[in-house]
Each structure stands twice: as structure tokens, then as C-alpha cells.
């Protein structure tokens, strides 16, 4: 899900009867998208033309990059925390997002942001900004948050768990096994899940989108 579409679902979904669980999925994927972007490019725009995290329906060439701390504290953390609260324990569709998946992504986001604040390798950031947290927390605080939320996920795994052997993780008969946390399930037999479907598919069959 692209950020603009997620903005639209989050902003307008409740007006047309979209369930809290589906809204939580939109929050999860928007938070995940911003998390991937901030790791790759540094600070990225939160305002796509209609205001920060607002649904934009017109072309805009005036977006300005937010800082790395702003992306994390305004987008990544709030969206993933909403997902943790509102998502169900079991996936809505095969391979779909759950409370456990959101907890683990949030844990990784806390860990990554803590490392960014600490900056042990003296890596430059863009746009340039002070490596301080808007809420006044230090790297150690975020590392503790990462530990705490990961422990919650491990103690409450939901439908996930370890297979009996490493062989089973990769063997064909055990496809869609319980070690895979998040993936897009595409099959030729199902019109909705067939990646090559001209109606519903993307013409590309992505499978096993495992948690980074």
C-alpha cells in the first residue's frame, strides 16, 4: 500500500464503514513504508501537499523533507503503535499482518532509531539535524522499548512459531509455514491472490515477504 492511499484510508475510512482492523492495517503499512524510507533516504516528506500525513489528491512540487526524528516520532512510531493496539491476533487473510507482526516491526524501529541517535560510526544524516529526540529520550531508552515490545511479541506469538527443522522452513510441502510472519500469497487458482490476474493482480507474483 502506498502512503497516499494509506492516508486516504486512515482519513476517510471510518466515514464509509471501514472496520478498525482494516484501518489498523493501513496504519501498519504506512508506518512500515516510512520506516523503510527513513532507513534508505534519511528524512523524507510527511506532507505530500495537503498537510502532514493528510490525503492529497492534487499534484504537489513543494514537499519539504522532514528530519529523521520527525519521521520516526510523527509517523513510524504512532502508526505502528496504533497497529499493535487495533490489529487482531490472527491474520485477516493468508499471510496478513497481525498484532505480533506489528510488535516486531515496532521493536525493530525502536532499535534502529536508538542506533541513529547514538550514531556509533559517525555517519552523516540528511537533512542535517541534531541527533536529539523531540521527546527527550536517549538511545538507551529506545533500546529498552525495543526489548520490551519484542518480549511481548515473543511471549504472545499468536499463530507463529518455529518449525521442527531448518529443512521444513524451505521445503515445498511446508510452504506458508508458521515461521513466516508476513507475505503476499499468490496462487493461480484464486483470482484475488493471483499476482498475474489482470483484474486483481499486479502482474508480478511476490511471495514470502518475510519480516526484515
Residue ranges and their predicted role:
Residues 1-5, 207-212:
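Conserved small/polar residues in nucleotide/adenosyl-binding loops
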Residues 3-41, 59-96:
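Conserved, well-structured interaction surfaces
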Residues 40, 55, 116:
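Flexible, glycine-rich phosphate/dinucleotide-binding loops
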Residues 44, 48, 81, 96-103, ...:
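An aromatic- and glycine-enriched ligand-binding surface/loop that stacks and positions planar moieties
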Residues 52-59, 131, 135:
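Aromatic- and acidic-residue-enriched carbohydrate-binding clefts of CAZyme catalytic domains
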Amino acid at each position: 500500500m502506498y502512503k497516499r492511499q494509506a492516508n486516504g484510508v486512515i482519513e476517510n475510512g471510518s466515514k464509509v464503514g471501514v472496520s478498525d482492523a482494516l484501518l489498523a492495517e493501513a496504519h501498519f503499512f504506512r508506518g512500515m513504508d516510512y520506516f523503510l524510507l527513513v532507513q534508505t533516504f534519511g528524512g523524507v516528506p510527511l506532507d505530500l501537499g495537503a498537510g502532514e500525513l493528510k490525503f492529497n489528491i492534487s499534484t504537489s512540487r513543494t514537499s519539504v523533507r522532514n528530519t529523521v526524528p520527525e519521521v520516526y516520532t510523527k509517523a513510524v512510531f504512532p502508526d505502528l503503535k496504533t497497529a499493535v493496539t487495533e490489529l487482531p491476533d490472527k491474520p485477516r487473510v493468508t499471510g496478513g499482518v497481525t498484532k505480533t507482526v506489528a510488535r516486531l516491526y515496532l521493536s525493530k524501529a525502536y532499535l534502529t532509531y536508538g542506533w541513529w541517535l547514538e550514531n556509533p560510526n559517525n555517519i552523516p544524516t540528511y537533512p542535517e539535524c541534531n541527533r536529539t529526540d523531540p521527546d527527550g529520550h536517549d538511545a538507551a531508552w529506545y533500546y529498552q522499548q525495543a526489548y520490551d515490545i519484542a518480549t511481548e511479541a515473543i511471549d504472545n506469538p499468536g499463530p507463529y512459531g518455529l518449525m521442527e527443522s531448518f529443512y521444513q522452513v524451505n521445503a515445498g510441502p511446508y510452504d506458508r509455514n508458521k515461521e513466516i510472519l508476513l507475505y503476499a500469497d499468490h496462487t493461480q487458482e484464486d483470482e484475488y491472490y493471483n499476482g498475474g490476474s489482470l483484474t486483481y493482480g499486479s502482474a508480478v507474483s511476490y511471495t514470502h515477504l518475510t519480516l526484515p
